[in-house]
Amino acid sequence: MFSLAWKSVRQRPARFLATLLAALLGAGVTMTFNSLHDTAAGAGVDDTSAETLTTAASVVGGYGTLLVFFAIASTLTVNVRQRGEEIALLRSTGATPAQIKRMVVGESVVVATAGMLLAVGPAMLGGRALFGMFQDSGQVGQDVDFAFGPIALSSGFAITLLAAVGAAFLAVRRATRALAGGRAPRGRLRVLGGAAALVLGAGSVAATFSMDATEPALMAAPAYGAILLAVGFAVFSPHLLRLLLGWFARPLARLGGAGAYLAVHNMRQRAAQLAGVLMPLILFTGVAAATLSMQTVENDALAASGLTKSVDDKNLETLNLTVVGIIAAFACLMLINSLYAATSYRTQEFGRQRLAGSTPRQVLATVGFEGLFLTLTGTFFGTLAGLAGTLAFTSVRTDTALPDQVYALWLGVLAVGAAATLLTCLGTTRRTLRTPAVAAVAVAG
Amino acid sequence: MFGKRNRGARAGRAGHPEALRLVKVSKRYGSGAGGGPQDNSVTALDEVTLSLPAGSFTAIMGPSGSGKSTLLQCAAGLDRPDSGLVMVDGEEMTGGSEAELTKFRRSRIGFVFQQYNLLPTLTVAQNTTLPLRLAGRRIDRARTEQVLAQVGLGDRLGHRPDQLSGGQRQRVAIARALVTEPRVVFADEPTGALDMRSAREVLRLLQQAVRVHGRTVVMVTHDPVAASYADSVVFLADGRLAGQLQSPSVDAVAERLAHLGDLAQGGARSPYPAAPGHPAPGTATDHTIRLGA
C-alpha cells in the first residue's frame, strides 16, 4: 500500500498542497524555537542566557505540537473526504480498511517529510532572527553563538511526523465511518468541553480582577480567559449561528433578493457543517485581537508611568507577538482550507441552482452573502471573547479607557478575517462556475 | 426591468405557433474540430433541422452517442451549437454570455432532468418557486399550491427532497418546470431513475401538461414505453435525424430503435445517405422534419 501512497502523491501533488503547507509551517515553527535549545546547550553559554533561551523555546513546545496536529488533521480530513469516490473504488476492488488506512498514513508521511525538508532552511533563518531579537534586547549575552543542531532537527521531525501519522489515522477513521453510513456521534463530550471552556474562560477573566496592577503575570489570566472563551464559542458555533439566523434571516432575505434568500436557507440547513469554518474564524479573531490589544494597553501603561521597558517586558512582548502570529497563521490556514473544501464540494449544488434559472452572478451573490454572514458571526463572537479579556486587563492595569490604537488593531484583525473568508469562498465559486451547469450537475459529489 | 418582466409574462400566454425551431444546428466535440489532418473530434450533431409546433409532445430517441442529449442541450440553451440557429417561441437564441442565456431561458424554457436536480436545502414549495424568485417575479402562493396539487404533492409543501421518493422528487421537478409557464419543457430521461409506477405517473403529468395546459414538451428517452406517451417520436443516429413516427406504439418504437442500433453498429459513419436528393428511409427531405399542426 505504501507504493500506492507514493504514486498517488506523485501523480497529483496539487491536492496535497494544504497538507504540505501545514507540515511546512508546523515543522518550521517547531524547529525555529527548538534551535534555541541547541544554542543554549552550546559551550560557554552563561546561565542567564541559557535560561532565557530555554524558557522561550519551551513556550511554543506544548501547544505548538497541538496546533500542528490539528492543522494537518484538518487538511487531511478534507483531502480524504474529497476522495470518497476513489476510496470507495479501492474498497470495491478489494482493499481492506487497514490497507486504505496504510495508504492515507503513507501519503501523509510522504507529504510531511517533504514539508519538513523544505522547512529546514526557513527555520534556520527564523531561528537566527529570533535569537537576534533576544540578543538585541540584552537578554542573551553578545558572546553567545547561534546554533541550529540536533535538538531542532530531531524535535521538528519527530513532532511533525507524529502529528502527520496521528492526523492521518484520525482523518481516515472519520472518513471510513462516514462511508459505512454511520452518523457522527452526537458529541456529549463536545458540549461538556465547550461548556467547561466557557466557564473556565469566564473564571480566568474574572481572576484578573483579583490580581495586582503591576504583577508581571497579569496579562496571562485575561489572555487565557479570552482564548478559552473563544474555544467555547467555537464549540457552540452551530447553535450561535442558528440563533443569529433566527433574528436576522428575514430582513436579510428581504434586502438581498434571491441570492440572500438562498444563502439564508443554505446556512440554516448546514449550520452544523459550517462550524468547521466558524471555529478557526472565531479563534483567529479572539486570540489575535485580544493579545494585540492587551499588548498595546500594556505599552501605553508603561509609557504613562514614565518607566522604560525592562528587558523582561520586551521579552514578553516579543513572545506574545510571536505566539499570536503562529496561532493566527494556523487558524488562517485552517479557515482557508476548510472553506475551500466546503465550497468546492458544492459544485453540483451550484450547477442545480444555475439550471433552475440562476445567473452566475446570482450564484456568487448567494455565496457572498453566506461568506458575509459567516464573517460577521465569527468575528462577532471572536470579538466578544477578545473584548472580555481586554476590558478586564485594561480596567485592572490602568484607569483609562481603551487607547485608540486598539480600535484600529481590531479593525485590522477583522479585515484579515473577512478578506480570508470572502476571497476564499468567492474565488473557489468562480472556479466552479467555469464548468458548464450540465457538466457540474453530473459530477459525482 | 419591468419591460423584461412584461415580455416574459407575455411569452407565457400568447405565443408563436412554432414553439421550437432548429435550423442546421451542428456541434462537434473534442480536439482538432475543423477537419484538419489530425481531426480527433466527434460530430455530435450534423446540421439538424427540426420544427416543433406549440402544444406538441415529442420524444427524441436514438442509440447511445446518437446526439440526442446534445440536441436537447443545444435546443435548451445549455450548450452552444457550433453553427446553426435555435429559435424558441419565434425568438432567436443568441449565444451570448451564460447570464444572457439564463435570462432567455427563464421565461421560455422549463427543465426536467433524470437526477431531479432539486436544491437539497429548500422545501418542496421553495424549490417550486425558486425559478420565479431568481427571475425576480412575483410569487403567487395560491398558484404554487395549485401546481403542486396538480402533481399530487399538495400535502408535501414543507418536506425537503431527501424526505421524498424518487417519483415524488420528479413530480416536484415537473411542478418547478411548469410554474413559470414556459413555452417549451425539456425533459432529459425523466423516467430513467424511476420504477415503473412512478415513471407512468411522471409521463402522464407531462402528457397532461401538453393536452390540458397547452405546453410543448420535448423529451429525450431511450425507453420505448416512455416514448409511446408522446404524440410523435423523432429518431437520431450519428448526429442526424433518422426518421419519425406519429402516434407511436411501444412495439413500433422498439422495432425502429433496434433497426437504428444495427445500422449504427454496422460501422457506417452515417447510415443514411448524406448526399442531398436521396432521402433516407422514413426521413423527410434533407433531414428536415416538420411535425403535424
Give the label of every model feature segment.
Chain A
Residues F2, W6, Q11-S35, T52, ...:
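Alpha-helical transmembrane segments, especially those used as permease/efflux helices
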Residues D47-Y63, S137-G166, P185-L198, S310-T322, ...:
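Conserved transmembrane alpha-helices of multi-pass membrane proteins
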Residues K7-Q11, Q82-S92, G246-A253, Y261-Q269, ...:
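Short amphipathic alpha-helical coupling elements at transmembrane boundaries
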Residues S3, T176-G187, L433-G445:
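Short cytosolic juxtamembrane segments of multi-pass membrane proteins
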Residues G28-T39, L76, V110-G138, A152-R174, ...:
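Small-residue-rich transmembrane alpha-helices
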Residues T32, L36-S49, G256, Q295-L316:
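A cross-kingdom feature of multi-pass membrane systems that activates on extracytoplasmic/periplasmic
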Residues A14-A40, E51-E85, V109-L118, P122, ...:
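Hydrophobic alpha-helical transmembrane segments of multi-pass inner-membrane transport and secretion
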